[in-house]
Amino acid sequence: MTSTRGSLLYEGKAKRIYASNKEAEVLVEFKNDATAFNAQKRAQLEDKGRLNCQISACLFELLEREGIPTHYCGLESDHWMVVQRVKVIPIEVVLRNVATGSLCRQTPIAQGTLLDPALLDLYYKDDDLGDPLLTESRLFLLDLVSPESRQEIETLARQVNAVLTPFFSALNLQLVDFKLELGWNEAGELLVADEISPDTCRLWDMNLRDEKERILDKDRFRQDLGGVIEAYGEVCKRVQGATPKPRNYR
């Protein structure tokens, strides 16, 4: 059984969300658009949507097997998936296992420093504001989530990290950092939403020492390194080789 596509509900930088014939579900189309720096840099990369969809499906199912709830229902095609409709929390959760990127620009922490335990940062999801960092006081002031919900969010995010880090390590990929979006479904259950892919994760090839060659994620696009699709394809190949074939939507 397939899901019937309805009207376009939302179009973001990397995905389109459509209504389906089930009120509690939506269809997600993964686009070939590549963006960086809050969409100030843009490009079309053939096959990017398919790769991110397939990687995300494999990783969502991996999390589910480990008891971590996600919004994923099943694949509709190679670049479409069906997911539960969720109320997305306007907070971006970032887990950092290795210091790089903005953390090193904003602090004296050296590039490549291992962070144990992982550093968890919360950001307010607003492109116009540049996704600012949320302190505890700002969270309270904005009244985005209750203290209990914040604890639930952070616990779930650390559980995701505890599953993904050793999984990627077994594939000779270092999970440097990643961002998560979470939301509540109709039953009030907190779910991992959005996607988990090289668009949302920094992944370094542990077989390579060169700081640029080892990058297998969106930084290849950000830094004009080239080989973006080849890098995403390599991640997809390793992930698919270590996980069951993702289920189709039924």
Curated annotation (Swiss-Prot):
InterPro entries attached to this UniProt entry: SAICAR_synt/ADE2_N (IPR028923), SAICAR_synt_PurC (IPR033934), SAICAR_synth (IPR001636), SAICAR_synthetase (IPR050089), SAICAR_synthetase_CS (IPR018236)
Keyword Thylakoid: no
SUPFAM superfamilies: SAICAR synthase-like (SSF56104)
Descriptive protein name: Phosphoribosylaminoimidazole-succinocarboxamide synthase
EC number of the protein: 6.3.2.6
One of the Pfam families matching this protein, by short name: SAICAR_synt
The species this protein was found in: Synechococcus sp. (strain CC9311)
Coiled coil: none
Catalysed transformations (reactions): 5-amino-1-(5-phospho-D-ribosyl)imidazole-4-carboxylate + L-aspartate + ATP = (2S)-2-[5-amino-1-(5-phospho-beta-D-ribosyl)imidazole-4-carboxamido]succinate + ADP + phosphate + 2 H(+)
Protein family according to the UniProt entry: Belongs to the SAICAR synthetase family.
Database matches in PROSITE patterns: SAICAR_SYNTHETASE_1
Involved pathway(s): Purine metabolism; IMP biosynthesis via de novo pathway; 5-amino-1-(5-phospho-D-ribosyl)imidazole-4-carboxamide from 5-amino-1-(5-phospho-D-ribosyl)imidazole-4-carboxylate: step 1/2
NCBIfam families in the cross-refs: purC (TIGR00081)
Biological process according to GO: 'de novo' IMP biosynthetic process; cobalamin biosynthetic process
Domain of life: Bacteria
GO molecular function, one term: phosphoribosylaminoimidazolesuccinocarboxamide synthase activity
